[in-house]
């Protein structure tokens, strides 16, 4: 039993989720296969096809790794999103020490040995922080706003610099596999759990090929998921706004009564009434939407539907 436990911690499983990366998957495989030669421990690659519709899977199945100890392909039944794809990969990971990287080669591969070393030193979690990367002004602004809001209202331990990936040990892996959350952030779930951690800043690279699949729609969903799943701030905000509007309504009503008593000839404020009603109904609908987000996620969790469905598994290190 002890030998088996030591064997599981003697290497690292690297989860690689991808979506329509036919232009760059070959370069990624060549690069990481060559890099593995510099490592003193084995790694296992777990590729997760998150509903690709191009030739990425076909190219991957045709590639033959020379230095990677084990590589496997997990194909999901449809596109579930990168966080669900990572969770799917973790359920199939053979080693206790795990991480995930993108197939676009933006993450430095040096995070693999450095993260592994920190885990062997006794840390449970190693956060890889983006230090330098060329991104658009809009993406940089979104990242800063997201980081600050999450740090203040959801998970206080979240790095203001932004975390791209995480290296973690078997305790975290077991926790994630036993608590597979849908409509959630896997990074915030790890941070929210605590454990002994360390942050390593690293220089990231520009995307080698193709275009990013990280669309604004997906960013907005992550933003909503992060707060609804890990913070009561939206509900508290609704309560505060409701209290402020209630107080404002009383003040406006008193002012109207006093004005009428002082000067009966003062006309009734039709435009003021319309503005107040429009504001009130607008806030009410927004509040209902926020509450509905919580209710929907609670209902979705209660149904117990799977966060992902694995359609196919294939060993890429076994010749056909």
Label every model-predicted segment.
Residues 34-37, 98, 124, 154, ...:
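Generic structural signal for secondary-structure transition and capping sites
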């Amino acid at each position: 039993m002890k030998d088996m436990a030591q064997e599981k911690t003697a290497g690292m499983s690297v989860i690689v989720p991808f979506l329509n990366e036919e232009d760059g998957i070959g370069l990624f495989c060549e690069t990481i296969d060559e890099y593995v030669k510099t490592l003193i421990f084995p790694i296992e690659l777990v590729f997760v096809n998150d509903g690709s519709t191009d030739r990425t899977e076909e190219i991957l199945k045709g590639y033959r790794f020379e230095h990677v100890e084990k590589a496997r392909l997990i194909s999901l039944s449809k596109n579930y999103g990168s966080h669900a794809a990572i969770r799917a990969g973790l359920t199939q990971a053979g080693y206790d020490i795990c991480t995930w990287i993108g197939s676009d080669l933006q993450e430095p591969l040096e995070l693999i040995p450095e993260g592994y070393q920190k885990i062997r030193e006794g840390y449970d979690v190693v956060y890889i922080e983006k230090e330098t990367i060329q991104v658009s002004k809009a993406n940089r602004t979104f990242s800063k706003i997201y980081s600050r809001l999450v740090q203040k209202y959801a998970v206080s331990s979240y790095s203001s610099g932004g975390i791209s990936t995480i290296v973690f040990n078997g305790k975290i892996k077991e926790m994630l596999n036993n608590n597979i959350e849908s409509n959630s952030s896997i990074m915030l779930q790890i941070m929210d759990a605590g454990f002994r951690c360390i942050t390593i800043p690293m220089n990231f690279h520009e995307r080698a090929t193709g275009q990013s699949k990280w669309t604004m729609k997906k960013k907005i969903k992550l933003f909503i998921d992060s707060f609804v799943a890990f913070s009561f701030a939206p509900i508290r905000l609704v309560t505060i706004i409701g209290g402020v509007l209630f107080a404002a309504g009383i003040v406006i009503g008193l002012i109207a009564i006093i004005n009428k008593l002082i000067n009966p000839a003062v006309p009734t404020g039709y435009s003021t009434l319309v503005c107040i009603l429009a504001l009130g109904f607008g806030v009410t609908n927004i509040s209902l939407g926020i509450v509905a987000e919580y209710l929907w996620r609670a209902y979705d969790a209660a149904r117990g539907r799977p966060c992902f469905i694995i359609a196919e598994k294939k060993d890429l290190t076994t010749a056909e």
